[in-house]
Amino acid sequence: MFLPRPDFRIALFICFMAVSFVISRFGSEVRPTLLLALPLVLGHVSTGLIGFVLNVIAGHHSTVTLAASTIGTALLWLPMLVPMGTLISLTVLVSQLHGAERERDIGPLFRQALWLAMLLGLVMFTFLSVVPALLPLFGIVPDIVPGAAKFLHVVRWGSLAFPLYFCMRYFCEGMHCTFPTMLLGFGGLLVLVPLSYALTYGRFGFSEYGVEGLGIATVMVMWLQAVVFALYLWRSRRFAHLQLFAHLELPCWARIRDLLNIGLPIGISILMEGGLFIVTTLLIGRFGTDEIAAHQIALSVAQLCFMIPMGVAEATTVRIGHAVGRCDLLVMRRVAWAGYAIVIGTQTLSASVLLLGYDVIVAAYTDDLVVASLASKLLLFAAIFQFPDGLQMLSSGVLRGMKDTRVPMLLAMISYWGLGMPLGLGLGFALEWNSRGMWIGLIIGLTAAAVLLGWRFRVVSERMFAGIP
């Protein structure tokens, strides 16, 4: 049973007026941010579409396959979030060096970031090797455990490729070069779709691997993207003067420490947020196969929408880092407000799509009526948290560009684990609202993060203008 579509014209009008006001004051910075963000957004959307396609393929194979891939993917993302976040420090430092015209320091920094990426890849491989044996301890429905374990055993072989790819990607973004992210994202999608379909269902001469096929295809695409990115940087004339691969350097712990001082709090912050969703997924696994399948449908759609503000936030990080490197605080503030205007606009669009088209979206995933009904309700919650999710992401990006990472880490911890998770547990388990209660906890945690990180941006920017370190 699908829900009636609410009338949200007043909310849309308010958002439109807010965006119009900010653009009227800071419009000159909107266009450069959009030009830098567009390839990043498209690259992230391609990543989101990969998750969407994998879920559609798994969902039409069987509900158990979808549930197993959901648990497996959640546990895959848990160690992936740390290198994703930690290596963002490379974008921050490269953009500031580029803005300060100290490009001779970029090549050595990049080579040390590669060492850090390999170290993080080793940690990721170890985690994915150990965690399948622990699956029964999570209280997940027994039917799901074998498939999730098989998926994790396969995808661990992409542990090194993943952080190396992000290291190269973050370097390019710091240099205002965002098209490789877009091209490799869609290239990976074009390879993954037929490959995962063939391996999951046993088409085009391949054996039927089920959920393992999704893992095999994912690993192959991870390595393909990493190798192609490395070849691009090696052959690119644009970066030839930086001598990225001129020679092999031993690890320099002083430079790696600089990367970790900025990046590790970012990695922990992202782990706090991503971990909230991952643990929520594992807990919803206790409610049964239908609940976890419906949750995954709603979550994958919400994650696809999230790719847009993520790209805008990354572009804002680069532009703010560049402005800070030039000591241009006025431009820094204008870029930040332009980013907020863009995100409010994109999130209004995302929420509108979810509110208007949730039944069509659910039908693309599954023909199971019970799962479809549950997923339709959860998509309405996903529409609500588009705004706090986008705003907290943008605030995080702004603060990263200003090299403020430690206090935001603590604010994220308070918001997600001090507020969002306890409320979700209370509503989901104590009041027996099941997945709906857990999603309300997500909304509250994201809203708290949006408010606190926005406040932090105001405090830090006022200190910078006052000349206070």
Swiss-Prot record:
Main localization of the protein described in the UniProt heading: membrane
Intrachain S-S bonds: none
Transmembrane segments: 10-30, 34-54, 74-94, 121-141, 179-199, 214-234, 264-284, 292-312, 335-355, 369-389, 409-429, 437-457
Lipid bilayer topology: Multi-pass membrane protein
GO process terms (BP): monoatomic ion transport
Compartment annotation: Cell inner membrane
Entry's Gene Ontology molecular function annotations: antiporter activity; xenobiotic transmembrane transporter activity
A cellular component annotation (GO) from this entry: plasma membrane
Entry-linked InterPro entries: MATE_fam, MATE_MdtK
Pfam families hit by this protein: MatE
Keyword Oxidoreductase recorded: no
UniProtKB keywords: Antiport, Cell inner membrane, Cell membrane, Ion transport, Membrane, Transmembrane, Transmembrane helix, Transport
Keyword Glycosyltransferase: no
Function: Multidrug efflux pump.
Family: Belongs to the multi antimicrobial extrusion (MATE) (TC 2.A.66.1) family.
Protein name as annotated: Probable multidrug resistance protein NorM
Protein species of origin: Xylella fastidiosa (strain 9a5c)
